Structures are given as structure tokens and as C-alpha cells.
């Protein structure tokens, strides 16, 4: 669960663009005319200093709009950003779907992350239309109380000893249900299976067992993110003043609002039932029951103040499901493509979990698995530029780089592939971070859940993903089961493919692996 995860889960924005092309054609003439006139008017009426940085993908003098430049960025962003920062250690501007974006080299990340004038919440609220109905999750994320961030950073950490074992037990059954027990080699759509696994596992800890086994809720949890990304993308193509009207005319807008309505209908009775139970217990002078899920943690953190419970849960699903899935799939694929890792990893899992059981301490001790995942994240970061934020006022960096108020800013992930920082950066070295953990000065930052300027896969504190601690535990838990229970190998003559769109770099949704059931399972302390 990450602020950046909220912005581009998997191939969602590629789906958004494709849907715009297929269903938004009747808008095209009006988009071109109205956007062009509005941009010209805003340019003529604007005042104040403008950025003097070059634009990598400028529109030509005869183009009324930046539509072509936006399409080009969506198609080429990762290669463009890599190309620029492999030769330049200085900022560059791009035309992106929401306007102009200044992308900084990672050498400026330390100064960037400390600037309060650059706001991630402003980005989430603006680019994901938090003021419009249907985007209720983003409205709750960006409220001044920041309740979601507090729950993720505090409750998911302190409650870990209580939820790790129940979550592991739930994941065990889900994995058997999804991946089966066939002991014959067969090809599976591992991308889709892992997405289903994460959806069901995350939902269990978010809303408890009752809704976690409700097929209608699971469908909303999985698909609401796609609908929201599609609609957000389509609205960003329109002038700001027209978006509230367009939102009511677009089919995806209607679908989005219907999903939110149904989510409320499913969740609200559970919330009301728990509150009534709590009040009744307190009236009798007895301690009310406590549930190990985020419904309970939101209630505890809110302390009786109003919050949008459904919006909070939809936002948690949006971030937790798709961000976690990408690293789970990427980590599994990298391990399978390096089969010499399978037995060392199984030995580690047998020893650590076999002796300590499912506890936060045991998950911490899975050091090789942790190193494999952090290396997967380094080799293929989920985004080529991260920590996107809007400037709340004019900002000038110490090197003179000027960012005008209202402009989008991000940091390139170029340092994660810099040979001066990482020897043989293109090579997947699963032991890289395990070796670093042997150095006391580097042991902390070498862990998957911790961040520094050399590895911004989860961002960089204080702009780091607040849910990374939970995500790392969950992913290691699921991978432990998958590696112990099943044999894996790559599909012959099927190279690994990535899907690149806008800022995102994802494992391709068509990714497949071969698998079969092994006779072994995880043996916990005290089991036969």
C-alpha cells in the first residue's frame, strides 16, 4: 500500500487509455477545440515566472492541443526517462496526461523529499478527481485528518503479531484453491492467479472474514481500481472546468459510482453491527470484542469522529492489491528464471518457519527471500519516476532548478540502475542485499521494507510507501507457500515481457509459468 501505488496500479492506465480510444471518440472534436481554446486563454492570462527547463516532448507550433505529446509520453516514457538520465544529471520537463511534469534526477531526491511545498496529497486529489462522486477513496485519502495514512503506519505495524498467523492460515487455503493440487506439469496464467491471491488475502485483513468470502465484495475490490483509473484518465483529457459535467456523461463514471454505492451497501451493515455491539457491551460494563482487521483499526483511530468507511476501504484495496501483486509476481518470476535459487530458498523457509512459526520475527529472518524481492524491485521498479507531487507554491532548489506553483514534480529511478552505485546493475543478483546486511552500517537499508536514496522502489522517507511493512510481510508469506508447495519452471521459448505505459513498468498480464504440486508443505512447530 503506497501513495504511489494509488496512482498507477499495474496496467490500469494502459487500460484507461485503450478505453478512451474505444469509447471516447464522440468527444474528440469537442476535446480538441475546447482544450485548445482554454489552454490558449490560460496561457495569455497567466502571470508569474515560468520554468525555463527544456521540454522533452514539446507540441509543435501548429498543434492546438498537447494530445499527441501526451500519447507519445504514454507510449515512450520509460525509455525516454532512461535515455535522458543515463546521459544527464539534470532535470527535464515532459508533457504528461495532466499537463507539464518536471522530472528530477535521483541526485536531487534528498532535497526533494524534505520539501513541504511539494505535496503528494495534492497530486492524488487533483489527478484522481477527489471532489467528484465515485472517487470517494481518494477523497478520504486526501482529507486533512489523513486517517488512512495513520492506520497504515501505526495499526498495521503494532497489530502485526496478532494478524500474521491468521493471515498465513487464510493464505494457505486460498493458495490451494487457486493453484490446485495437480502433480503434473501444467502451464498457468500466473499473473491472474497472483492477482486473485493478493485480492483475497488483502481483503481478509482489510474487512474480515465475512466480506473476504463475499464474491460481490471481492469483485468490487479487484475491479474498482480499474474502473477508477479508466475514468480518471479520461477526465484528465478534458479541460478542468468541463470534468464535472463529463463525469456524469461517461459510461465509466456511472459504473464507478455504482461500484461505490454497492460497496457502501455491503460494508455499512457490518460497521453498524459492530458499533451497536460495542455500545451494548460498554453499557453493560464489559469489554467489547476486538477484531483483527482494518475495520476495527479505522474505528480505533477515528475515536468516534466521522470518516468515510467505504471510501477508506476502497482506497486501501486500490493501493494494497495492485502494488502488492506487482512485486509478488515479479519476485516469483525472477526466482523461477534463476532455478538455482529454489532449493536455498526452500531450505531457508523450512528452517525459519519450521522453527519459529508464522511470526513477524520469522518473516524478518527470511533474509535470502527478502534480498531476492528487493533485487527484483531494483531491477524492475514499478515506476520509472516516483513520488509525484504538486508544487503548492513557487519552489527553487539549491542548484537553481525552479518549479512554478501548480506544476507536477517527480524523481527518476535512475540511481537504481547506476553502475557507480550498484556493480553490474543490469544483472539480477539475488544475494546482493543479503551481503549488504552483513555490514552493520548498511544492514538496515538493505532490508526490503526500508528505504534510502540508492533504492527508491518504495519511495524515500518521509515520502515512502506507508504500507511497505505490511506488503513485505504478506509477499514473503505467500511466496513461502508457493515455493514449498509447488515446483516451478519457465514456459519454453516464452521470454519475459514487460508492459510499459506512462510512468509504469509492469510484468505483462499475459505472463505464464509452468508448475506442479510437490509432496512437501510448510511444517509448523508442533506439527507432525
From Swiss-Prot:
Organism of this sequence: Aspergillus terreus
Lumenal side: 45-528
Biotechnology: Lovastatin acts as a hypolipidemic agent that works as inhibitor of (3S)-hydroxymethylglutaryl-coenzyme A (HMG-CoA) reductase (HMGR) which reduces HMG-CoA to mevalonate and is the key step in cholesterol biosynthesis. Lovastatin, simvastatin and related compounds are widely used to treat hypercholesteremia and reduce the risk of cardiovascular disease. Furthermore, statins such as lovastatin were found to be anticancer agents.
Name listed for the protein in its UniProt record: Dihydromonacolin L monooxygenase LovA
InterPro entries linked: Cyt_P450, Cyt_P450_E_grp-I, Cyt_P450_sf
Keywords: Endoplasmic reticulum, Heme, Iron, Membrane, Metal-binding, Monooxygenase, Oxidoreductase, Signal-anchor, Transmembrane, Transmembrane helix
Reactions catalysed according to its record: dihydromonacolin L carboxylate + reduced [NADPH--hemoprotein reductase] + O2 = monacolin L carboxylate + oxidized [NADPH--hemoprotein reductase] + 2 H2O + H(+); monacolin L carboxylate + reduced [NADPH--hemoprotein reductase] + O2 = monacolin J carboxylate + oxidized [NADPH--hemoprotein reductase] + H2O + H(+)
Pathway(s) served: Polyketide biosynthesis; lovastatin biosynthesis
Chain ranges passing through the membrane: 24-44
Summary of the function given for this chain in its UniProt record: Dihydromonacolin L monooxygenase; part of the gene cluster that mediates the biosynthesis of lovastatin (also known as mevinolin, mevacor or monacolin K), a hypolipidemic inhibitor of (3S)-hydroxymethylglutaryl-coenzyme A (HMG-CoA) reductase (HMGR). The first step in the biosynthesis of lovastatin is the production of dihydromonacolin L acid by the lovastatin nonaketide synthase lovB and the trans-acting enoyl reductase lovC via condensation of one acetyl-CoA unit and 8 malonyl-CoA units. Dihydromonacolin L acid is released from lovB by the thioesterase lovG.
Amino acid at each position: 500500500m503506497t501513495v504511489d501505488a494509488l496512482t498507477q496500479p499495474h496496467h490500469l492506465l494502459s487500460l484507461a487509455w485503450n478505453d478512451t480510444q474505444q469509447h471516447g471518440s464522440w468527444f474528440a472534436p469537442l476535446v480538441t477545440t475546447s482544450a485548445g481554446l482554454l489552454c490558449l486563454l490560460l496561457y495569455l492570462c497567466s502571470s508569474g515566472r515560468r520554468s525555463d527547463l527544456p521540454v522533452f516532448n514539446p507540441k509543435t507550433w501548429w498543434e492546438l492541443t498537447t494530445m499527441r505529446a501526451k500519447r507519445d509520453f504514454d507510449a515512450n516514457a520509460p525509455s525516454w526517462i532512461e535515455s535522458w538520465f543515463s546521459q544527464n544529471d539534470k532535470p527535464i520537463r515532459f508533457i504528461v496526461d495532466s499537463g507539464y511534469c518536471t522530472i528530477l534526477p535521483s541526485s536531487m531526491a534528498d532535497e526533494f523529499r524534505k520539501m513541504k511545498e511539494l505535496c503528494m496529497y495534492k497530486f492524488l486529489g487533483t489527478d484522481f478527481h477527489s471532489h467528484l462522486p465515485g472517487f470517494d477513496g481518494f477523497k478520504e485519502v486526501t482529507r486533512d485528518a489523513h486517517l488512512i495514512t495513520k492506520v497504515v503506519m501505526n495499526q498495521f505495524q503494532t497489530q502485526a503479531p496478532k494478524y500474521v498467523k491468521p493471515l498465513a492460515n487464510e493464505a494457505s487455503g486460498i493458495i490451494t484453491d487457486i493453484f490446485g493440487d495437480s502433480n503434473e506439469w501444467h502451464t498457468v496464467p500466473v499473473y491472474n492467479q497472483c492477482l486473485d491471491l493478493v485480492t483475497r488475502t488483502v481483503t481478509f485483513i482489510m474487512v474480515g472474514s465475512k466480506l473476504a468470502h463475499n464474491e460481490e465484495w471481492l469483485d468490487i475490490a479487484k475491479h474498482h481500481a480499474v474502473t477508477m483509473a479508466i475514468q480518471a484518465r479520461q477526465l484528465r483529457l478534458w479541460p478542468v472546468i468541463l470534468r464535472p459535467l463529463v463525469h456524469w456523461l461517461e459510461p465509466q463514471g456511472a459504473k464507478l459510482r455504482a461500484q461505490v454505492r454497492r460497496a457502501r451497501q455491503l460494508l455499512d451493515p457490518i460497521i453498524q453491527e459492530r458499533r451497536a455491539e460495542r455500545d451494548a457491551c460498554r453499557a453493560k460494563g464489559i469489554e467489547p470484542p476486538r477484531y483483527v482487521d482494518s475495520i476495527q483499526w479505522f474505528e480505533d483511530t477515528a475515536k468516534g469522529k466521522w470518516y468515510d468507511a467505504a471510501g477508506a476501504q476502497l482506497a486501501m484495496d486500490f493501493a494494497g492489491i495492485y502494488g502488492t501483486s506487482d512485486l509478488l509476481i515479479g519476485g516469483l518470476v525472477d526466482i523461477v528464471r534463476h532455478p538455482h535459487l529454489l532449493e536455498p530458498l526452500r531450505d531457508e523457509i523450512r528452517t525459519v518457519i519450521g522453527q519459529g512459526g508464522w511470526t513477524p520475527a520469522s518473516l524478518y529472518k527470511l533474509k535470502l527471500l527478502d534480498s531476492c524481492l528487493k533485487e527484483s524491485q531494483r531491477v524492475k521498479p514499478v515506476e520509472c519516476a516516483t513520488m509525484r507531487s504538486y508544487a503548492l507554491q513557487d519552489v527553487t532548489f539549491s542548484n537553481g532548478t525552479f518549479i512554478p506553483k501548480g506544476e507536477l514534480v517527480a524523481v527518476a529511478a535512475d540511481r537504481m540502475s547506476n553502475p557507480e552505485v550498484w556493480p553490474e546493475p543490469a544483472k539480477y543478483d539475488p544475494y546482493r542485499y543479503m551481503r549488504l546486511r552483513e555490514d552493520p552500517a548498511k544492514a538496515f537499508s538493505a532490508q526490503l521494507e526500508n528505504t534510502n536514496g540508492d533504492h527508491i522502489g518504495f519511495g524515500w522517507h518521509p515520502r515512502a510507501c506507508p504500507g511497505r511493512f505490511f506488503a513485505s510481510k504478506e509477499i514473503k508469506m505467500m511466496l513461502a507457500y508457493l515455493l514449498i508447495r509447488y515446483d516451478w519452471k519457465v514456459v519454453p521459448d516464452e521470454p519475459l515481457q514487460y508492459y510499459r505505459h506512462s510512468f509504469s513498468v509492469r510484468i505483462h498480464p499475459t505472463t505464464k509459468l509452468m508448475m506442479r504440486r510437490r509432496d512437501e508443505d510448510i511444517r509448523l512447530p508442533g506439527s507432525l
